[in-house]
Every structure is written in C-alpha cells, then in structure tokens.
Amino acid sequence: LRMSRGLGDGYKRQALDYDALRPLVDMDALKAFRAHSLNPEHPATRGTTVNPDIFFQCREACNQKFAAIPEAVEHYMAEIGKLTGRTHHLFDYYGAPDAERVVILMGSAAETARETVDYLTARGEKVGLINVHLYRPFSAEHFLAAVPASCKRLAVLDRTKEPGAMGEPLYQDVCTVYQERGIPMTIVGGRYGLSSKDTTPGQICLLYTSPSPRDMRRS
C-alpha cells in the first residue's frame, strides 16, 4: 500500500517514458498473468467460493508472497532511481545524523516537515524525519534501519482517525515494532490533515520542541 494525498499531489508532473521503464518489466510474466485474467475476447465463468475447511489455510498461505514484497519494492526503487536520479527507500530518513527526536509520517506533509527539520537543525537542534513510502506490508527491519541509533523520542502522525481505538494504524505499528523487540523508546501518536486541513511548519515545530510527550499531544 502506497499512500498519496490525491488532489493535492496526484497530478502528473514528470511522466517517465514507457520505453525507459520497459526493461524493468518481465514481459513474459506479464503475458502469462494476462492470459489467465478475464477477457471479453475469450469469456469464461469463474466462481470465488472457498469452503471453510480450507479458507483459513489459503489466507495464511499468502504470507510468504507478502513477506517478499518489501525487498522487491526496495530493488525497483533503486532501479527507478538510476533512471531519474531520485532514489527513495521504504523509509527515508532526513535530518541530523545524531537526532534525538524524530517525526514519522507519510504523504505530502513530509515536505512541510522536511522544511521544519532544516530550520531546526540550522539552529543546532537534533531532530529528524522519517517519510514512509511503503506502508503495507510494514517492514520492521527496514523501519528500524532508518531510525537513528541516537533517537530517544518518536512522534508518529496518522492522517486518519480511528474512533475507539487505542491509536491510529501507523502509530500502533511503530509501537508493536518496539514492544515485540523489547527496545525502550518514548512514542507518542497524533493526527494531522484530516479533510485536507493544512499542516503548518509551526505545528510540526511544536512536535520537536515540546518538552514532554503530553505537551506534544496537546499541540
């Protein structure tokens, strides 16, 4: 699952040429996939019923396929980077190499956070930002590799509200990563940008400069 804001940044800016992308596509595999897909040129009737005696097993059997996705995405991100000169990873870190306070989010607000990080690091603040490019499957290993070893406090921002839940999805994923591994970390969750409400540099700045997690939530 790749997250995009939609209206705000979903317009075409610089389209990559299909001929340049073609070497990255396994055309034989693509043809084989299409040969088994539904097509009005050779119609067929298919059912989707699975009996309860094997449904559970079928759902679990796909785990290996999903587990392989992060490495595949990382590989093709590197290949696209060779074409464009813009290299991305599943989790991109930006900021001070010895950051103690890090904000985690995804989508267009990352650019606002990036400018805020520039402003604060220029003044000697040890802060950073992690921009999530691949949310599902969530790769704990790639995530931890992106977090500076010096980090003491994480602020995880979600662009959704889950009424009744203990926290929003990205926040809970990050908490789970640290809890399962017994790694001590102060983690606070927050929300931003619902219904395209603007997120300002001043608001991001408060996440870094608030003296305590409780104050961060209030900001």
Model-derived features: where do they sit?
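Hydrophobic transmembrane alpha-helix bundles
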Residues: 31-48, 129, 165-180, 219
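Single conserved hydrophobic/aromatic residue that forms the stacking wall/gate
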Residues: 1-11, 208-218
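Short, flexible coil/turn micro-motifs enriched in small/turn-prone residues
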Residues: 1-3, 42, 102
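Thiamine diphosphate
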Residues: 75-210, 214
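Conformationally flexible catalytic loops at phosphate/diphosphate-handling active centers
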Residues: 5-92
